[in-house]
Amino acid sequence: MAPKKDKVPPPSSKPAKSGGGKQKKKKWSKGKQKEKVNNMVLFDQATYDKLLTEAPKFKLITPSILSDRMRINGSLARRAIRELMAKGVIRMVAAHSSQQIYTRATNT
């Protein structure tokens, strides 16, 4: 019979532990700040014309989408939607206390 070899544990990739050393302190990350948007509070003629021509072509119309695309504030966007509804160029899809969804008016 061949002589028995001593079992040696495989070398581990972790370094040997050296006493209860202090862990590296976590750094605080710099919080990302959103850029302030300077939206209009009143319509100028160019923006109003753009609203009347482009908004009825949107597939989905909400106050937040109008506010984003037209650079107008939320209350102005709600007023604009109310006016487009009165003219009959958009129709309501769903209404909730905090979110109203509209779409372009089709023949149906």
From Swiss-Prot:
Transmembrane segments: none
InterPro entries xref list: Ribosomal_eS25
UniProt keyword annotation of Cell membrane present: no
UniProt region (Disordered), positions on chain: 1-36
Gene Ontology cellular component terms for the protein in this record: cytosolic ribosome; cytosolic small ribosomal subunit; plasma membrane
Biased composition (Basic residues): 22-31
One matching Pfam family: Ribosomal_S25
Keywords attached to this entry: Ribonucleoprotein, Ribosomal protein
Entry annotated with the keyword Ribosomal protein: yes
GO molecular function: mRNA binding; structural constituent of ribosome
Family per similarity comment: Belongs to the eukaryotic ribosomal protein eS25 family.
PANTHER family named in the record: 40S RIBOSOMAL PROTEIN S25
Official protein name in the record: Small ribosomal subunit protein eS25w
Lineage, top ranks: Eukaryota, Viridiplantae, Streptophyta, Embryophyta, Tracheophyta
Name of the encoding gene: RPS25E
